């Protein structure tokens, strides 16, 4: 969508699932708020509605301004290393981003994804910006596309059950969210994580989202901060889930 000379991208919630919840757009908007508090370079998303569906959260959209232009392009990491199997390993990615001066940014992205449990950081959802005229790499692209964060398929209000589900999620970069995030921590990142304690969402930017869900995700962030700092698995911090996460998950099927 073009507006006032700028290009905006609109993304709807998943309509293909059996029970479309509309949470993906809100997940994107919540992740955007968290990113603003934690990341240096990120794409900003906000919630918008079409006029005829203004009161239906399930018909929400997330909107962002395009981060590319005629002079600056984006190349996916997966396209850069299409024939290199080893390039999909976290250490290989870290080495690549270090080679273009973006090691700190990549480390932060991994910790951010663990904080919000973003399950969709595939090889096309990160990469580099380049000069369209010279093809010179300008740096790592800003963090974008976070609609699979904050468990968009979970529609309950029970925190322990949610964490039992969360304990079964896998990162797309490595298998273990918190193991990878803990591995890439630096002293600076530890300070940044500790400074996030007490994080609260701006409710005015999440119109229509129940307060109960917002509080669930704020508690999730608090638990993930402590788990990442300790290197503990998702849901294992005392007061942040159950000690028998798999058994609790099994009960959801009854």
Q: Over which residues does each language-model region extend?
A:
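Short, low-complexity, polar/charged sequence segments that are solvent-exposed and flexible
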Residues: 29-32, 81-85, 160-163
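A broad, structural surface signal
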Residues: 8, 29, 33-37, 104, ...
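Short C-terminal domain-edge/linker segments immediately following a structured domain
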Residues: 39-44, 94-97, 171-178
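ATP-dependent phospho-/nucleotidyl transfer catalytic cores
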Residues: 56-58, 62-110
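C-terminal catalytic region of ATP-dependent kinase domains
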Residues: 23, 131-254
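Conserved kinase catalytic-core segment
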Residues: 89-152
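Conserved ATP-binding subdomain of kinase catalytic cores across diverse folds
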Residues: 1-77
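Short alpha-helical "patches" and their helix-cap loops
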Residues: 45-54, 123-131, 238
């Amino acid at each position: 969508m073009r507006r006032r000379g700028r290009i905006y991208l609109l993304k709807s919630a998943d309509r293909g699932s059996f029970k479309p919840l509309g949470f993906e757009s809100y997940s994107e908007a919540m992740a955007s708020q968290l990113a603003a508090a934690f990341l240096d370079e990120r794409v900003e998303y906000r919630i918008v509605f079409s006029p005829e569906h203004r009161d239906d959260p399930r018909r929400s959209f997330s909107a962002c301004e395009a981060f590319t232009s005629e002079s600056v392009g984006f190349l996916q990491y997966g396209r850069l290393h299409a024939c290199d199997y080893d390039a999909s390993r976290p250490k290989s990615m870290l080495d690549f981003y270090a080679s273009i001066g973006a090691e700190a940014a990549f480390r932060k992205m991994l910790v951010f994804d663990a904080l919000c449990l973003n399950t969709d950081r595939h090889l096309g959802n990160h990469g580099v910006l380049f000069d369209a005229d010279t093809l010179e790499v300008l740096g790592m692209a800003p963090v974008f596309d976070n609609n699979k964060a904050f468990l968009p398929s979970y529609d309950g209000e029970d925190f322990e059950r949610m964490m039992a589900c969360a304990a079964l999620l896998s990162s797309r970069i490595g298998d273990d969210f918190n193991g990878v995030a803990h591995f890439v921590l630096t002293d600076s990142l530890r300070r940044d994580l500790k400074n996030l304690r007490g994080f609260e969402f701006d409710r005015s930017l999440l119109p229509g989202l129940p307060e109960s869900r917002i509080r669930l995700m704020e508690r999730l962030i608090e638990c993930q901060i402590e788990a990442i700092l300790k290197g503990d698995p998702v849901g294992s911090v005392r007061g942040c889930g159950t000690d028998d996460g798999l058994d609790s998950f099994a009960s959801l099927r009854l």
